[in-house]
C-alpha cells in the first residue's frame, strides 16, 4: 500500500488513541486472519528478527509498522515459545526512539550472552536531505523484557558501501563471535561483509573482509544473510535482489536462496566449495528467512510469508504479512531439507481419510501419498464452481504445479499465478498446511517447499480430488 512519506514516518507518540482504535477496528473486520501462524495485530509484518534461545524459551521478533499495511517507521515486536509452535506475543521491544535508529529499527539478530539477550540490528537514520545513513547498533534485553540500548554505534557505514548496508547476523563459530552484514558496493553490486568481535567483546567489532561465497555479478543487493552450520557444514541463506534469471529460475520479485558449502575459512574469508545457488522455496511468498543454530543442536528457520513492494488484499484492512511455520533444517545428499518442527503434530485433531470435503474451516493438514506413474490434481480453497488452488502432482513426468489463478482475490499478477518444480518420478509424499489464507506445501518431508497466500471468499473452503487416487489423511488443526 502506498502511503505518503509524512504518514509512514510519523512519530509513534503522534498517533491519537482514536486513530489507533480505528485501525484496530478495521483489522478485526478481515476474513483472512490466520490461527496458527504469527501475524501482526495491526499494520505490516515483514522480516523475522532475533530468532534465538534465551531464558529457557525460544525468542522470535518481527519487523512491524503498526499503523497500516505499508513500510513505515519500523519497530521490533517480541514473541516467545517453548515448543516453536505456540508463540506468545509480549509487545514492542525496540522502538525507533534514539538518534541511531530515528527512522527505523531495522532487521537484525540476537544471541544469548550471560543472563541477557544481545540484539544486533540496523538503525536507519536519514538526514535533512533524506539521505539514509545505516548504522549497525545493539541493545540488551533482560529476562523481564527490559531494553537497554547501547550508546555507541557498533559498526559504522564503511567507505566501500552505499546506503544499503543492513541485517547483521551474529553467530558463534568455534568459540569466536562473528557477524555478517548484507551490503551494496559503490558500483551497485551485492555482497556480504564479515566481522569478528575482538576478544569476543560484542561492543568491539573488526572487519575481516568481504566474504567470498561464489556470489553472482548480477545481484545489486544481498539482504538478510544468514550463516548456519548443519553437522558442521556451512549453509548460507540469503535474499539476492536483482539476481539474473539466467542464473536461477525464479518468478517472484526477489528470490530467497541458499548455498551449501564445505567449510568456512575465517581468514580469507570464504565459504569454500559453495554449491550452485538454489531456491529455498518454490512458492509465491517466501522471503528474508532467518535461521540459527539452537542449543539443542538443531537448526531452525522461519520465513516472512510476503515480499517487498507487493500489495496484498489484506491491505484494505490495515494489515499485511505473516511468518511461516518454524522449520527444522537438515542436509541429505548435499541438499537442504526443511520441514515443520515435530511439535506441529500437537495441533492435529483426529485423523480422517482424505476424501471430497465441500466445506472445511480452512485450518488443516493433509498428508498424502501419490503413487508412482500417476497424475493427480487437487483443489484446495475450493467452491462449488470449480474454483480453488489447483495442485497437480505428476509422478509420471516428475513435476509439481501450483496454480492460484482461480483461488480467491487475485493480486501480484505481473509475477504470474503458477509456480512449479521438478521432483523424482516416483512415489511422492506431500504434506500441506492450510491456515485461512496461507498454504505451506512440503514435498517428501522437506526436499522441496511451496509457500504462498490465498485470499478466499467465504464459500471457498472445500477440498476436491479432481483426478488421481492419492491416499492419506486429513487433520483439522486446532491452535
UniProtKB/Swiss-Prot annotation:
The enzyme's E.C. designation: 3.2.1.26
Record-level Gene Ontology MF annotations: beta-fructofuranosidase activity
Predominant subcellular localization, coarse grouping: cytoplasm
Subcellular localization: Cytoplasm
Keywords for this protein: Carbohydrate metabolism, Cytoplasm, Glycosidase, Hydrolase
Pathway connected to this protein: Glycan biosynthesis; sucrose metabolism
Gene3D superfamilies referenced in this protein's UniProt entry, alphabetically: Exo-inulinase, domain 1, Glycosyl hydrolase domain, family 43
Enzyme class: hydrolase
Binding positions (substrate): 44-47, 63, 106-107, 166-167, 223
Keyword Cytoplasm: yes
BP-aspect Gene Ontology terms: sucrose metabolic process
Record flagged with keyword Cytoplasm: yes
Residues annotated as the enzyme's active site: 47
A cellular component term, taken from the record's GO annotations: cytoplasm
Pfam families documented for this protein: Glyco_hydro_32C, Glyco_hydro_32N
PROSITE patterns xrefs: GLYCOSYL_HYDROL_F32 (PS00609)
InterPro entries: ConA-like_dom_sf, GH32_Enzymes, Glyco_hydro_32, Glyco_hydro_32_AS, Glyco_hydro_32_C, Glyco_hydro_32_N, Glyco_hydro_beta-prop_sf, Suc6P_hydrolase
Catalytic activity as recorded in UniProt: Hydrolysis of terminal non-reducing beta-D-fructofuranoside residues in beta-D-fructofuranosides
PANTHER family linked to this entry: BETA-FRUCTOSIDASE
Stated family: Belongs to the glycosyl hydrolase 32 family.
Protein name: Sucrose-6-phosphate hydrolase
Species name: Streptococcus mutans serotype c (strain ATCC 700610 / UA159)
Gene: scrB
Amino acid at each position: 500500500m502506498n502511503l505518503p512519506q509524512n504518514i509512514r514516518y510519523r512519530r509513534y507518540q503522534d498517533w491519537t488513541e482514536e486513530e489507533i482504535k480505528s485501525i484496530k477496528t478495521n483489522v478485526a473486520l478481515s476474513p483472512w486472519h490466520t490461527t496458527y501462524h504469527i501475524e501482526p495485530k495491526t499494520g505490516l509484518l515483514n522480516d523475522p528478527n532475533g530468532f534465538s534461545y534465551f531464558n529457557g524459551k525460544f525468542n522470535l521478533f518481527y519487523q512491524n509498522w503498526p499503523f497500516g499495511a505499508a513500510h513505515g517507521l519500523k519497530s521490533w515486536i517480541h514473541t516467545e515459545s517453548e515448543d516453536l509452535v505456540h508463540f506468545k506475543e509480549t509487545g514492542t521491544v525496540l522502538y525507533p526512539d534514539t538518534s541511531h535508529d530515528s527512522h527505523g529499527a531495522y532487521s537484525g539478530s540476537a544471541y544469548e550472552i550471560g543472563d541477557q539477550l544481545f540484539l544486533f540490528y540496523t538503525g536507519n537514520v536519514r538526514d535533512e536531505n533524506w539521505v539514509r545513513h545505516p548504522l549497525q547498533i545493539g541493545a540488551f534485553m533482560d529476562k523481564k523484557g527490559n531494553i537497554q540500548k547501547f550508546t555507541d554505534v557498533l559498526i559504522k557505514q564503511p567507505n566501500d558501501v552505499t546506503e544499503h548496508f543492513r541485517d547483521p547476523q551474529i553467530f558463534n563459530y568455534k568459540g569466536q563471535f562473528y557477524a555478517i552484514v548484507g551490503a551494496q558496493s559503490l558500483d551497485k553490486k551485492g555482497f556480504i561483509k564479515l566481522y569478528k568481535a575482538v576478544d569476543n567483546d560484542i561492543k568491539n567489532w573488526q572487519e575481516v573482509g568481504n566474504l567470498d561465497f561464489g556470489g553472482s555479478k548480477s545481484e545489486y543487493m544481498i539482504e538478510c544473510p544468514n550463516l548456519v552450520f548443519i553437522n558442521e557444514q556451512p549453509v548460507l541463506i540469503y535474499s539476492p535482489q536483482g539476481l539474473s534469471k539466467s542464473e536461477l529460475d525464479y518468478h517472484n520479485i526477489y528470490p530467497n536462496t541458499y548455498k551449501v558449502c564445505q567449510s568456512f575459512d575465517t581468514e580469507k574469508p570464504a565459504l569454500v566449495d559453495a554449491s550452485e545457488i538454489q531456491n529455498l522455496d518454490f512458492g509465491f511468498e517466501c522471503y528474508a528467512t532467518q535461521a540459527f543454530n539452537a542449543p539443542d543442536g538443531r537448526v531452525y528457520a522461519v520465513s516472512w510469508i510476503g515480499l517487498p513492494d507487493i500489495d496484498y488484499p489484506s491491505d484494505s484492512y490495515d494489515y499485511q504479512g505473516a511468518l511461516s511455520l518454524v522449520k527444522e533444517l537438515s542436509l541429505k545428499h548435499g541438499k537442504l531439507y526443511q520441514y515443520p518442527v515435530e511439535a506441529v503434530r500437537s495441533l492435529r485433531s483426529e485423523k480422517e481419510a482424505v476424501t471430497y470435503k465441500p466445506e472445511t474451516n480452512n485450518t488443516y493438514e493433509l498428508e498424502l501419498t501419490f503413487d508412482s506413474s500417476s497424475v493427480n490434481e487437487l483443489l484446495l480453497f475450493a467452491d462449488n464452481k470449480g474454483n480453488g488452488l489447483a495442485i497437480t502432482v505428476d509422478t509420471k513426468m516428475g513435476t509439481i504445479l501450483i496454480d492460484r489463478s482461480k483461488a480467491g482475490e487475485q493480486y501480484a499478477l505481473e509475477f504470474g499465478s503458477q509456480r512449479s518444480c521438478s521432483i523424482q518420478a516416483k512415489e511422492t509424499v506431500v504434506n500441506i498446511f492450510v491456515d485461512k489464507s496461507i498454504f505451506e506445501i512440503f514435498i517428501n518431508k522437506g526436499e522441496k517447499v511451496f509457500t504462498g497466500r490465498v485470499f478466499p471468499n467465504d464459500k471457498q473452503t472445500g477440498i476436491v480430488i479432481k483426478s488421481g487416487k492419492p491416499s492419506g489423511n486429513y487433520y483439522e488443526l486446532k491452535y
